[in-house]
A protein has these predicted regions:
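Beta-propeller-forming repeat regions
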Residues: 14-16, 23-505
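C-terminal motif of bacterial Sec signal peptides marking the signal peptidase cleavage site
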Residues: 5-6
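Short, conserved catalytic or interaction motifs in soluble domains
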Residues: 9
Length: 505
């Protein structure tokens, strides 16, 4: 839903690339009538978002996409635009569309040998009837994995035995809280008592839809365990994430929420703390941005001025990364730091990290949500928005991964710099021959700030996200991925990081 300066063998293919395909396929005709028609279509189809690129879908798909677009306009109840003829609009997009959108086969992509192997260790697991794992977090202090299940709404903790001994690990996980289709849980110390608490975004439904069933809840930790969830705000749409943040510098902790919604609902929200106790705050819900589609929020000082900023990613038709620079006292300046080339690029997630370790925080993002069109797309994958300082940004495309939903960064190969790992989810991968799609890849950073792509696993494109951690205590960063599509399996899978020489002994 977000070219970049290329870092792999095909630098021109990337979400921020500008290609000849952006030219009107109809305007190449010589008639004045065709030029007028093209201009009319482009005004109409590019009014609410970027003008769609005809090459992003095959010819056969454009009738459905065009009719959907017209229906969106009708549902919006707008009457200020002149509608072009629907059949002519379909012909316009089909004229520039390929018969097929081709994606390179994973097993035919050239890549150098990987210095690492990630080996699945099935001793680490917490079996679930229907995982639908929305988030996994590793807690080094307790040697635990916290994970949320969006289908049943549970937030659970799975603990490893002492000294990383998997023989002491419990096969069962401990229930922390149950919400209404819990998505992400942000660990924090809300009341500053030294115990971990969780701010939880609740979707309110498992299927997509426009409704007011979503919530934001707070789970407080104590010496005896976790208290029942307290609802901070209800009657929201589909809340994917809530973050603690003193938005207005008044000393009270507020909440920023990514309320994704669907088509007619959703917003970037602020729960402003109006007082009360830390355990029972009085919150006022304020809409900061009425647009639907925020996929997440992160908070950091990205311009180095000592004030906290916050970054919001938008999916749906917007496909942007938008940074709100903090100016103090609840004032912010918004800037779009990355804008994907087309409404179909499917921004899925992002993280703030100093990827090049130059002292300035960067952004690594994935685009690859395939749950709308169920199409493999060659422009899905991982990108880097590099912070050059003084609020200037450089965009780089790291590489392809169909269905890329999330990434994590760590020094995977132990050479002192940060590498990137990402997972993909594509439900139709199971219908293709083996070797068609990668499901997990990592990008090895080289001294010249380039990245070399390596495949970790193929075909099992069922993962919603990932994180890195030294799970077995050997000093190497391992990989934890969370399961979404397959029933009656572990909610997560742990891949241990091994040098090639060791793993082949």
């Amino acid at each position: 839903m977000l070219g970049l300066i290329g870092c792999d063998s095909s630098p021109s293919v990337g979400p921020l690339a500008t290609t000849k395909s952006r030219m009107s396929p109809v305007r190449e005709n010589q008639t004045e009538q065709s030029k007028v028609l093209a201009a009319k279509i482009e005004r109409f189809c590019g009014d609410c978002h970027k003008m769609p690129d005809p090459t992003t879908f095959p010819k056969s798909r454009w009738p459905e996409e065009v009719i959907q677009g017209f229906n969106f306009y009708v549902d919006s109840q707008r009457t200020d635009m002149e509608e072009p003829d629907r059949l002519e609009t379909i012909k316009y997009f089909q004229a520039g569309a390929p018969d097929h959108v081709d994606v390179p086969r994973a097993d035919q992509m050239e890549q150098p040998p990987s210095p690492l192997r990630f080996v699945l260790d099935e001793r680490y697991q917490a079996k679930m009837e229907s995982p639908s794992t929305a988030q996994v977090q590793w807690d080094q202090a307790t040697k635990s994995i916290f994970f949320s299940n969006m289908r049943d709404g549970e937030l659970r903790q799975w603990s490893l035995g002492s000294e990383q001994n998997t023989s002491e690990a419990s096969p069962e996980s401990k229930l922390i809280a149950t919400g209404s289709h819990t998505c992400r849980a942000t660990k924090c110390d809300w009341n500053q008592d030294g115990f971990d608490d969780f701010l939880i975004g609740e979707m309110g439904s498992f299927p997509v839809g426009d409704h007011e069933k979503g919530r934001i809840s707070l789970v407080l930790g104590t010496a005896q365990g976790y208290l029942p969830p307290k609802i901070l705000q209800d009657k929201l749409s589909r809340v994917v994430e809530a973050r603690p943040f003193d938005y207005d510098d008044d000393g009270r902790m507020d909440v920023l929420a990514a309320d994704f919604g669907w088509r007619t609902t959703g917003a970037l929200r602020l729960l402003k703390n109006m007082g009360g106790s830390a355990e029972s705050p009085q919150m006022e819900s304020i809409i900061l941005d009425p647009r639907h589609g925020p996929v997440g929020i992160d908070i950091a000082d990205l311009d180095g001025d000592g004030k906290q900023d916050f970054l919001v990613g938008y999916g749906q038709e917007f496909e942007t990364l938008e940074l709100h620079y903090g100016q103090g006292q609840g004032k912010y300046q918004r800037e779009i730091v990355a804008s994907l080339a087309d409404p179909s690029y499917n921004l899925s997630a992002f993280q703030i990290v100093d990827l090049d370790q130059d002292g300035k925080l960067d952004i690594v993002y994935t685009c690859g949500d395939t749950m709308d069109a169920l199409l493999a797309k060659p422009y899905h994958g991982v990108g880097w928005v590099r912070n050059l300082g003084e609020r200037k940004w450089e965009h780089r495309w790291l590489g392809l991964l169909v269905g890329a939903l999330a990434s994590s960064t760590a020094d995977l190969d132990g050479d002192g710099d940060l590498d990137v790992v990402a997972v993909g989810m594509f439900p139709k991968a199971k219908d293709e021959p083996e070797g068609t799609f990668d499901s997990i890849c990592w990008w090895e950073q080289t001294p010249d700030l380039n990245f070399v792509r390596h495949s970790i696993e193929r075909d099992r494109c069922t993962y919603a996200s990932c994180t890195t951690a030294d799970v077995n205590g050997d000093g190497r960063q391992d990989l934890i991925v969370w399961e979404w599509l397959i029933p009656n399996v572990s909610a997560f899978r742990v891949y241990l990081n091994q040098p090639v020489a060791e793993s082949t002994r």
